[in-house]
């Protein structure tokens, strides 16, 4: 059986990267929350 996690850095960046987060209002909300929490890493 094929495993569900097939790592790809390109897909990872496109789906969870900083620019994709900034592209939508909800994505910006996520970044805002992570900044408020004090995360050192905001996105993938």
From Swiss-Prot:
Entries under InterPro entries matching the protein: Ribosomal_bL34, Ribosomal_bL34_CS
Keywords recorded for this protein, A-Z: Ribonucleoprotein, Ribosomal protein
GO cellular component: ribonucleoprotein complex; ribosome
Keyword Hydrolase annotated: no
Keyword Acyltransferase assigned: no
Pfam families to which the protein is assigned, alphabetical: Ribosomal_L34
Annotated region (Disordered), positions in chain: 1-44
PROSITE patterns the record matches: RIBOSOMAL_L34
GO BP, one annotated term: translation
Superkingdom to which the source organism belongs: Bacteria
Coiled coil (UniProt feature): none
GO MF term set: structural constituent of ribosome
Extent of Basic residues compositional bias: 30-44
Gene3D superfamilies for this protein: 1.10.287.3980
Family to which the UniProt record says this protein belongs: Belongs to the bacterial ribosomal protein bL34 family.
NCBIfam families tied to this protein: rpmH_bact
Protein name: Large ribosomal subunit protein bL34
């Amino acid at each position: 059986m094929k495993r569900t996690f097939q790592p790809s850095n390109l897909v990872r960046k496109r789906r969870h990267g900083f620019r994709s987060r900034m592209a939508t209002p909800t994505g910006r909300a996520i970044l805002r929350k992570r900044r408020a929490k004090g995360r050192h890493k905001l996105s993938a």
